Amino acid sequence: MEHGCMAELGRRVRIGGPYFEDLAHGRVFADAPSVTLTDGLAAVSQAIFGDRLRLPLDATLCAAVTGGAAALAHPMLVCNVVIGQRTGPSQRVRGNLFYRGLVLLRPVFIGDTLRTRTEVVGLKQNAVREGRPATGLVALRVRAANQHGEPVLDFWRCPMLPLGDAGVRTGHADGFEDIPAELEPGQVAAAVPEGWRLDAFRDACPGEHFADLVDGTLYEVESRDTVTCAPELARLTLNMAQTHTDAAASAFGRRLVYGGHTISVAAAQLVRALPNLVTIVAWRGCDHLAPVFEEDLLRSEVEVGSLHPLDGGGGLVELRVVVHAARGVTADAEEARVLDWRLWGLMA
């Protein structure tokens, strides 16, 4: 049984998430608590990642650019909260394979409240391998809205879940072809916030802006970050995946770092390469290539891709961030590629 809020007297009820065979196409999860983004949430997230993205840090600049009094919530804080809200169906996750088609449809500010809805849109049982637990892939469509019912985030993710009964043959064999492999430029441009004064950002912030970028430039961020506070971030964002807080639930015998933690480190390192990044608008895709563990040392390579000017100045830039991990405290250990993140950023 997945959960038991209405247990009969004297009945023993185990509380936990579904196994792969418990899920069905079209099943919707919409029972997660809504979350109001607060200064406290933002401060704890900032303490973990030390991100230098300007608008969430600078109230004066934020007001000049956005025209509002509220502070912009960091896009990664928004993503982490929404992902955490939606871990109900993936509490038993063995690992998350990818994110696809993530678009931040409108800005989110401190004080906004996020509500999410997740639908099972694809199921694929993996081939049984000797000596390994039986598993399956679950394609989830996640949508989030603010307190006004306005959509703020839309994406697909693919967790791998174990089967409760290794002998079950579900027949699920979806190919996930309906999950978009790419985002169209027009789709991303439609998510650029209306009315933002990118000229005010350019005037206030010295250094490279959109017009200074060169397609094909590769930035190697030398300063590495040690992964810390991984269970704390999971709890902060209501992430219920057992593998992030319980080593016994991990396929590796040690706690697995939540994928958004690694992406957030990558985002912070991205801003070191591009200090005048205005915000993140969308993710073309994000693949977890290998697991990340606490105390790993992460470094990023940032590649500038295609540049898309906007009519009012500034533009969208396609970026690719590849993250490498050296394991544990052995700073000189051989590195592993752990993340391939393709995103769209807004520059002034």
What are the functions of these language-model segments?
Residues 31, 116-118, 221, 300-302:
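A generic structural signal for residues embedded in beta-strands
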Residues 2-99, 153, 163-181, 186-283, ...:
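Hot-dog-fold acyl-thioester-processing enzymes
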Residues 82-83, 102, 107-117:
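Long, hydrophobic/aromatic-enriched structural stretches that serve as scaffold segments
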Residues 67, 73-74, 105-110, 257-258, ...:
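Short, low-complexity cationic-aromatic patches
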Residues 3-25, 110-191, 294, 303-348:
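HotDog/MaoC-like acyl-thioester-processing domains
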